[in-house]
Design a protein with these regions (language model features):
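N-terminal pre-P-loop "Q-motif" helix
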Residues: 237-266
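Conserved lysine of the Walker
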Residues: 278
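Hydrophobic anchor at the beta1->P-loop junction of P-loop NTPases
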Residues: 270
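Conserved adenine-nucleotide phosphate-binding loops and their immediately adjacent elements
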Residues: 220-245
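The conserved Walker
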Residues: 274
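Post-Walker A helix-loop "phosphate-sensing" segment adjacent to the P-loop in P-loop NTPases
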Residues: 287-295
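Hydrophobic positions on the alpha1 helix immediately C-terminal to the Walker A/P-loop
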Residues: 281, 285
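Accessory nucleic-acid engagement/destabilization modules that flank
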Residues: 1-215
Length: 296
């Protein structure tokens, strides 16, 4: 479900009139009967001002589609910002942008795709923003039949508009290269670079047609658990882990390696309600530990 959708021209006007955050808030209440927290409202006002700067270019068609807060089906996750249109050869393109208000980030060694940053009142391990954008795009593509039938190409990226890159840049260290290649990271002072990234894919407006295709796409049936586990043990990727799932997975892997090294037993209890992805974490761990010879 898309919370807010409009043309690029609609979005620019709403930001100019200081109404965009209110429009999103009202739509969320209308569609989901949920009140918006003040910090979330402020984050929209802040981040969307930066997206205004990025999109305020005549080379990006005024009738391109803009979506804000797209709820990924079968998950509780939301894509922050989407812009849609056609490329030079009329190929359908959708740019997915993960917006972050972080101003400091630390690399996390020894755990795939994790970084440390201040969030939720403390410094925590979270997924790298490039991994987050890439995994959201992969999830949408895997489960939305319109994406595959319409040959819609997804272009994920992350925009950390409060964060200034350093030299060497922590978010672009060797351990993150694979994810940054698939989903580039743009930081404070790089609005023009993000604009160029969008302009490469969106040259002709789609009048929101691609947003409609995404929002109305038929959801593919869930994969067979038995077949998926067999495929994963053979080295194939079947279930993509999102956000906290990836963090928990990496923490358990770290603990498993510690147990192998010091020969001590440890128990990890993963709590979560229905649909939070405990099974996804478990089968990814089963496949990984089996392939690494760590599963007894």
């Amino acid at each position: 479900m898309i919370v807010y959708s409009g043309l690029k021209s609609d979005f620019l006007t709403a930001v100019e009139q200081d109404s965009i955050a209110t429009e999103i808030e009202e739509t969320i209440y209308k569609k989901m009967h949920r009140r918006t927290a003040q910090n979330e409202f402020c984050s929209w006002e802040n981040s969307l001002e930066y997206m205004y700067k990025v999109l305020n270019d005549k080379a990006i068609p005024s009738d391109s589609g803009v979506a804000i807060e797209y709820n990924i089906p079968q998950t509780s996750k939301r894509v922050d910002f989407i812009i849609s249109g056609y490329g030079e050869k009329q190929n359908p393109n959708v740019v997915i942008i993960e917006l972050k208000q972080w101003d400091k980030v630390e690399a996390v060694d020894g755990q795939d795709a994790l970084v440390g940053t201040y969030t939720g009142g403390a410094v925590r391990k979270v997924v790298h923003p490039s991994y987050q954008a890439w995994s959201y795009a992969a999830m949408i593509y895997d489960y939305n039949q319109n994406m595959q039938m319409g040959n819609i190409i997804l272009h994920p990226c992350a925009y950390l508009h409060n964060y200034r890159k350093s030299n060497p840049e922590k978010l672009e260290q060797k351990q993150y290269k694979e994810y940054v290649k698939d989903a580039p990271v743009f930081a404070r002072g790089e609005a023009l670079k993000l604009r160029e990234f969008i302009k490469k894919s969106v040259k002709v407006g789609d009048n929101k047609q691609l947003l409609y295709d995404i929002d109305r796409g038929k959801i593919k049936p869930s994969k067979s658990l038995q077949n998926a586990i067999k495929s994963m043990i053979e080295g194939n990727q079947e279930f993509i882990m999102l956000d906290e799932q990836k963090v928990v997975y990496e923490e358990i892997l770290k603990t498993a390696l510690l147990c192998m090294n010091d020969q001590k037993k440890r128990t990890i209890i993963v709590k979560g309600g229905p649909g939070t992805g405990k099974t996804v974490v478990a089968i990814n761990l089963l496949a990984k530990l089996t392939n690494e010879g760590l599963f007894a």
